[in-house]
Amino acid sequence: MKKPITPWTPMSVQEGEDCCSVSMWDRTYMVDKNVLFTSIVSRGNEILSAPMRLVGLENGEEIVWKEQSPFVMSGDEEQVTLCCSEESSTFIVNTALKIDFDGYCDMDIKIMPRGRTVAEEFGVDKVKPNEYSLDKLWFEIPLKK
C-alpha cells in the first residue's frame, strides 16, 4: 500500500447509501450518487454554495439523469478513484473521479448516445439509427463568494 509523503496524512473514504466522503489533510470532499461534489470543506470552510451539476438540453428538453450506479473503484492512503454511470432518455454518462492525498482532483466525464447510432448494414432488417440531439451541455460549479 502506498503512503503519502510527509507532512500529508493518509486518505480515508466512507461510503454511505447515497453519498461518499473522502478526507485528506485538512480537506473533505462529499460526493453524491453521480460522483460530483456536493460539498468541499477546506480548513473548516465550505467552498461550494450548492452541489455541482452536469446540466444540458437533449432534444430541446432539460436532461434528467437517472439510473445512477456509483462505486469506489480503488482506494488507498494516497489516492481514491470513484466511478459512476448514469443515464438520461437519450445519453449515457460515465464519470471517473481521482482524488490524490494532497487534494488534487482529476475528473473524467464521457458522454455517449444510447442505443443504435448508425444504420445496420449486415443485418437482415434495415434499422434506422435513433435520432437524438444534444443541444447544450455544461458543468455547474457554484463557488461561494
Protein language model annotation of sequence segments:
Residues M1-P10, G16-S88, K145:
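Acidic-aromatic substrate-binding/catalytic surfaces of carbohydrate-active enzymes
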Residues P7, D18, V93-T95, M107:
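Residue-level marker for the onset of beta-strands and adjacent loop->beta junctions
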Residues S39, L82, V93, D106-M107:
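Short hydrophobic/aromatic-rich beta-strand segments that constitute the beta-sheet cores
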Residues F91, K98-K145:
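Acidic (Asp/Glu-rich), glycine- and aromatic
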